A protein has these predicted regions:
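Residue(s) in the substrate-gating loop at a strand-loop-helix junction
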Residues: 9
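Short, flexible catalytic-loop segment of classical short-chain dehydrogenase/reductase
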Residues: 13, 51-62
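Short C-terminal tail/terminal secondary-structure segment
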Residues: 14, 92, 103-118
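Active-site "substrate specificity/gating" loop of NAD(P)-dependent dehydrogenases
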Residues: 15-19, 24, 41-42, 60, ...
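Active-site helix of classical SDR
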Residues: 25, 33
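Alpha-helical segment proximal to the catalytic Tyr-Lys
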Residues: 38-42, 100
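Conserved SDR Rossmann-fold cofactor-binding beta-strand/turn motif
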Residues: 46-56, 95, 108-110
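A conserved structural motif in NAD(P)-dependent oxidoreductases
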Residues: 76-87
C-alpha cells in the first residue's frame, strides 16, 4: 500500500509560551494525519506523522552552541540535538513494508524531549 508521512513537531504534542501560531499549525498537521489515516485506511494507504524535537538545522543554527547544549542537557534524555539524517531515517522507516500496519501515529523523534516534559 501507499504511504504518507507528514512532518509536524513536538510542539504539536504540547505547548510552549509565545509561539502559539506555530503550535497551532503543528497540532493541525497531527489532526490532519489522524483524519487522513481514517479516510485512506480502507484504500490500504497509511498516514503517519513525524514530530521532530531539537534538530541541528537552519532553524536552530542561529542559537549559540552553548545554549543548544544547555537546552539538550536539561530537556532531552539523550542530551543532544538530532542530526537531520536521524529524522530522515525514521521517516523512511514508516514507508517500509514492515510499517504496513502502523497508521494514524504522531511519532516523536526527539531524544526523549516529550518524556522529560511529562
Amino acid at each position: 500500500g501507499a504511504r504518507i508521512v507528514n512532518i509536524a513537531s513536538t510542539e504539536g504534542l504540547g505547548a510552549t509560551r509565545f509561539i502559539s501560531p506555530y503550535t497551532a499549525a503543528k497540532t493541525g498537521v497531527i489532526g490532519l494525519t489522524r483524519s487522513l489515516a481514517v479516510e485512506l485506511g480502507p484504500e490500504g494507504i497509511t498516514v503517519n506523522c513525524i514530530c521532530p524535537g531539537p534538530i541541528n538545522t537552519g532553524m536552530t543554527q542561529r542559537i549559540a552552541p552553548e545554549q543548544k547544549a544547555e537546552f539538550a542537557r536539561r530537556r532531552t534524555a539523550l542530551r543532544r540535538y538530532a542530526e537531520p539524517e536521524e529524522v530522515a531515517h525514521m521517516t523512511l522507516s514508516l514507508c517500509l513494508p514492515s510499517a504496513g500496519y502502523t497508521t494514524g501515529v504522531a511519532l516523536p523523534v526527539d531524544g526523549g524531549l516529550t518524556i522529560r516534559n511529562a
